[in-house]
């Protein structure tokens, strides 16, 4: 990782010199590069494991569903990059694999989605310390979160098995990040 950090540092310094960036702009550029590299690495590991377990498409469906709802509902983030990485593997690879292995029924997940509906209605959008929400945007984001939830659940009822299970699971997963127990830990 040190080699990658050094490479990012050198590239950011070159950009700073060429573009005459202030120190703050340099730090922003460097942080942006670090985020891209870290997220690329996480994606390679997560989707690589999904490929090895033959659940790539299921992982992708869960991830896309999760991100679609998260766009409007926001929610908790992991405290560290490493914890985020571990949570990604558990949430997007191991749990979908378990859903396949133990043939968790769509009906069971659908019943759990009622809990998700209550969570989204009550807690979305969930602000965090790193991603606060302006008070004037809360009502609009709540309405959009509920609409997206309904659309995703409608899609889950239309798409064939086993894909419908992973749409519902993605919604469940994202709704749990809205719970206040995670916001308190992040000190909203």
From Swiss-Prot:
It is found in: Cell membrane. One of its GO terms (biological process) is proteolysis. It is a multi-pass membrane protein. GO terms for cellular component: plasma membrane. Disulfide bonds: none annotated. InterPro entries: AgrB (IPR006741). It holds the Pfam family AgrB. The chain crosses the membrane at residues 49-69, 104-126, 143-163, 166-186. Its EC number is 3.4.-.-. It is an enzyme of class 3 (hydrolase). It comes from the Bacteria. GO terms for molecular function: peptidase activity. Keywords: Cell membrane, Hydrolase, Membrane, Protease, Quorum sensing, Transmembrane, Transmembrane helix, Virulence. Belongs to the AgrB family. HAMAP family: AgrB. Essential for the production of a quorum sensing system signal molecule, the autoinducing peptide (AIP). This quorum sensing system is responsible for the regulation of the expression of virulence factor genes. Involved in the proteolytic processing of AgrD, the precursor of AIP. This is Accessory gene regulator protein B. It comes from Staphylococcus intermedius. The gene is agrB.
């Amino acid at each position: 990782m040190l080699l990658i950090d050094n490479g990012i540092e050198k590239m950011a310094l070159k950009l700073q010199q060429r573009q005459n960036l202030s120190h703050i702009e340099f730090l922003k550029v460097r942080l942006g590069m670090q985020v891209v590299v870290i997220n690329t690495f996480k994606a390679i590991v997560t989707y690589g494991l999904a490929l090895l377990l033959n659940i790539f498409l299921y992982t992708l469906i869960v991830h896309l569903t999760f991100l679609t709802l998260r766009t409007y509902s926001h929610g908790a983030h992991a405290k560290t990059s490493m914890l985020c990485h571990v949570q990604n593997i558990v949430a997007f690879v191991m749990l979908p694999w378990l859903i396949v292995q133990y043939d968790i029924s769509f009906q069971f997940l659908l019943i759990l989605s009622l809990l998700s509906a209550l969570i989204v209605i009550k807690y979305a959008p969930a602000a965090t310390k790193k991603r606060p929400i302006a008070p004037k945007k809360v009502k609009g984001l709540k309405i959009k979160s509920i609409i997206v939830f309904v659309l995703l659940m409608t899609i889950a009822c239309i798409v064939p098995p086993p894909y419908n299970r992973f749409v519902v699971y993605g919604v469940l997963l994202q709704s749990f990040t809205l719970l206040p127990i995670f916001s308190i830990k992040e000190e909203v």
